[in-house]
Regions:
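Helical subdomain adjoining the active site within ATP-dependent kinase catalytic cores
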Residues: 289, 293, 307-349
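Activation of the activation-loop gatekeeper triad in protein kinase-fold domains
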Residues: 230-235
Length: 349
């Protein structure tokens, strides 16, 4: 990388390129010490960079800047689950190394291979492909989620990756804690939704590897197939129906990397994208799930997403976000809380 200006190379928010280059050259055979990095747009929390030494390219992930919930940005867990899933039917990038020393780039981080594929964020991007291809892509997305939930955690070394017993109750408590720690305004529906969720937690429907943020713009697509599932920062062992419910809430509200308030502009609003009923039918055909208490799961998913977006809104107000779109993060929070309450009305508990 001769001729690269050091001051320019170091002007990448969240990375010390000299330190990172030295670490990469020691950890990855053939990697050079002088690297450049580009922040990949689209990430709402953990920061993702494309790093190159001029010969090879890698993806580096580190936690966000500033006010964060530590357990939601545990790089070691994200690295572990992807490493475990290599060789299974679930497409994940090959992991190359991790570092717990915050002295290298300012926080723990890990490195993985760069996988070919496109991350689709908007309806316009899918409309350019046509309805038939959009239907194929969205079908593959649901099939991938179903396949993930059929993986037996113990078979891939993840038997101790979480505590599935009491998962739903802990989720209710966890997102209340995050929302309380990030709230910047009066949100009366938040208190009511939490109270109703906490008062009627069902027994878990099953145990599986929960991704925690499964949606189209968290996968890569090549030739209409899923080539990689990304953003495992919330992964754990728990109730798989929580992933399905969150996918549907994302679809209803059009939430994705753009954090836009209009579902019509989100990728899941594109012509040909499988409908909610089709998503549920396809998923249940793969997993043989029981949807008796699905209203609770939808209410919890809406509460979780509201807490996540309010946390992003808080970081934006504090000047601790990197990238575009964060000024819109808080717009959907009140509507999500209201939708969560509506979902509980349809619960069969």
């Amino acid at each position: 990388m001769a001729g690269v200006n050091s001051a320019h190379r170091d002007a990448v928010v969240g990375l010390d390129l000299d330190q990172l280059g030295a670490w990469l050259s020691a950890a990855i055979p053939g990697a050079g010490t002088r690297v450049t990095a580009t922040l990949i747009t689209g990430g709402r929390s953990n920061l993702t960079y494309l790093v190159s030494d001029g010969r090879g390219e890698w993806i580096v992930r580190r936690p966000p800047l500033g006010h964060v919930l530590a357990s939601a940005h545990d790089m070691g867990r994200e690295y572990r689950v992807m490493t475990a899933l290599c060789g299974t039917p679930i497409p994940v990038p090959r992991t190359l190394g991790s570092c717990d020393d915050p002295g290298v780039v300012g926080a723990p981080f890990y490195v993985m291979e760069r996988v070919e594929g496109t991350s689709y964020h908007s309806a316009a991007e899918l409309e350019a492909l046509g309805a038939d291809r959009t239907r194929t892509i969205s079908t593959r997305l649901v099939e991938t989620l179903g396949a993930l939930h059929r993986v037996v955690p113990g078979d891939v070394g993840l038997a101790d990756f979480g505590r599935p017993e009491g998962y739903l109750a802990r989720q209710v408590a966890r997102w209340k804690k995050q929302l309380d720690g990030s709230r910047t305004r009066d949100l009366p529906d938040a208190d009511e939704l939490h109270s109703r969720l906490a008062a009627d937690v069902p027994a878990e429907s099953g145990v599986g590897i929960v991704h925690g943020d499964f949606r189209l713009d968290n996968v890569l697509i090549l030739d209409d197939q899923v080539t990689a599932v990304l953003d495992w920062e919330m992964a754990t062992l728990g109730d798989p129906l929580s992933d399905l419910a969150l996918m549907l809430v994302y679809k209803r509200f059009g939430v994705g990397a753009s954090i836009g308030p209009d579902p019509r502009t989100a990728a899941s609003g594109a012509p040909g994208f499988v409908s909610e009923s089709e998503i549920i039918e396809l998923y249940c055909a793969i997993t043989d799930c029981d949807l008796t208490r699905f209203g609770f799961y939808l209410g919890l998913a809406a509460y979780k997403l509201a807490a996540v977006l309010e946390g992003i809104h808080y970081r934006y107000l504090q000047g601790q976000t990197v990238g575009e779109g964060f000024d819109r993060a808080g717009l959907l929070v009140p509507d999500l809380l209201e939708a969560g309450l509506e979902a509980l009305k349809d619960d069969c508990g």
